[in-house]
């Protein structure tokens, strides 16, 4: 819900050709209709019922990005906004007291994961600043997320506690035991997105 949709969105941004934006919106709504769970989150795979942090982070970032460009009267905007708001409401519930989200979002025993936390912060901050979300609720949550994620940047400007690349597996322990990486680009990019949303 990010890797394909962002290509269409960037093609639209580069060319101004609306067909790319329409394709992006159609792809996103198709994914939402098929994959979003009742709690607003997304399984790592249809046959793997775990809400892996960075997997959901891509979805959150993808929806926030397209909503920035999609006109108010676009036929798919309401559907995407509904999916986005449902996801953001769920993420509010699962944010830890430390401001972070867990490597498995709905498992308190999972470790705080920085790349997904930065992605969620980006998506939530974008919504609060654009008036899509209640700023009095989501603004403080996004700010808390940013402060928390910034605390995971080490003295060499590397983000710590980034989950290693993770394929699907229907095994809880497999996810809970994923390695924590320092300096992975999945984390760097997400932090820059969050910073851009804060400054935008």
Task: Give the residues covered by each predicted segment.
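Loop-centered beta-sheet repeat module
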Residues: 9-10, 18-64
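Long, well-ordered core segments of solenoidal/helical folds
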Residues: 18-41, 81-99, 141-158
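Solvent-exposed loop and edge beta-strand segments that line ligand/cofactor-binding
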Residues: 1, 43-61, 72, 76, ...
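Well-ordered alpha-helical scaffold segments within catalytic/enzyme domains
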Residues: 3-17, 60-76, 119-133, 190-200
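Charged catalytic carboxylate motif
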Residues: 3, 23, 58, 83-86, ...
